Amino acid sequence: MSVILGIDPGSRVTGYGVIRQQGRHLIYLGSGCIRTSDLELPLRLKQIYAGVSEIITQFQPDAFAIEQVFMAKNADSALKLGQARGSAIVAAVNAELPVYEYAARLIKQAVVGTGAADKSQVQHMVQQMLKLPGKPQADAADALGVAICHANTNKTLIALAGQATSARRGRYR
């Protein structure tokens, strides 16, 4: 049983989603958005750090998963996104959480089945997978998608490790 915090970083809106992985089941614990004010970037980064730190304190996750930076058309936007990611990652590292990063296409593939999915498809599938009563906010749904991607990746790695151990045992008997 592990608790996973997923983050969809942004300099103005950072989505978060928290799930518990119990065997093959994923249980929704919470989600939302950290909305920064129209202050200068350094103060927004401070708000992201404080918000993520508060979420970590509230939910006590075992793992921290975050979406990787994609190449934006606007270099300034990509740099600000990278700084927002950095603020969130520092909060996780300060809490001594392991940090995992996933590409947006991999997250969409894990949640929807195609890396080219749009936001509404991710929202719909997150709602279905976690049995939510309504559609989550877009940024929160993306963050829950990051957490789901990590849970699925983690399950696959554990299964592969178990198969490798079984194969080794069989071979050396």
Swiss-Prot record:
PROSITE patterns: RUVC (PS01321)
Main location: cytoplasm
Entry keyword annotation includes Transmembrane helix: no
Catalytic site positions: 8, 67, 139
Family annotation (Gene3D superfamilies): Ribonuclease H-like superfamily/Ribonuclease H (3.30.420.10)
Enzyme Commission numbers on file: 3.1.21.10
Record keywords, A-Z: Cytoplasm, DNA damage, DNA recombination, DNA repair, DNA-binding, Endonuclease, Hydrolase, Magnesium, Metal-binding, Nuclease
InterPro entries, sorted: RNaseH-like_sf, RNaseH_sf, X-over_junc_endoDNase_Mg_BS, X-over_junc_endoDNase_RuvC
SUPFAM superfamilies: Ribonuclease H-like (SSF53098)
Cofactor: Mg(2+)
GO biological process, one term: DNA repair
Subcellular localization(s) per the UniProt record: Cytoplasm
Binding site for Mg(2+) 1: 8, 139
Cofactor binding annotation: Binds 2 Mg(2+) ion per subunit.
One Pfam assignment: RuvC
Cellular compartments per GO CC: cytoplasm; Holliday junction resolvase complex
Binding site for Mg(2+) 2: 67
One GO MF term: crossover junction DNA endonuclease activity
Reaction equations catalysed: Endonucleolytic cleavage at a junction such as a reciprocal single-stranded crossover between two homologous DNA duplexes (Holliday junction)
Subunit and partners: Homodimer which binds Holliday junction (HJ) DNA. The HJ becomes 2-fold symmetrical on binding to RuvC with unstacked arms; it has a different conformation from HJ DNA in complex with RuvA. In the full resolvosome a probable DNA-RuvA(4)-RuvB(12)-RuvC(2) complex forms which resolves the HJ.
Role description: The RuvA-RuvB-RuvC complex processes Holliday junction (HJ) DNA during genetic recombination and DNA repair. Endonuclease that resolves HJ intermediates. Cleaves cruciform DNA by making single-stranded nicks across the HJ at symmetrical positions within the homologous arms, yielding a 5'-phosphate and a 3'-hydroxyl group; requires a central core of homology in the junction. The consensus cleavage sequence is 5'-(A/T)TT(C/G)-3'. Cleavage occurs on the 3'-side of the TT dinucleotide at the point of strand exchange.
Family under the similarity heading: Belongs to the RuvC family.
Record's protein name: Crossover junction endodeoxyribonuclease RuvC
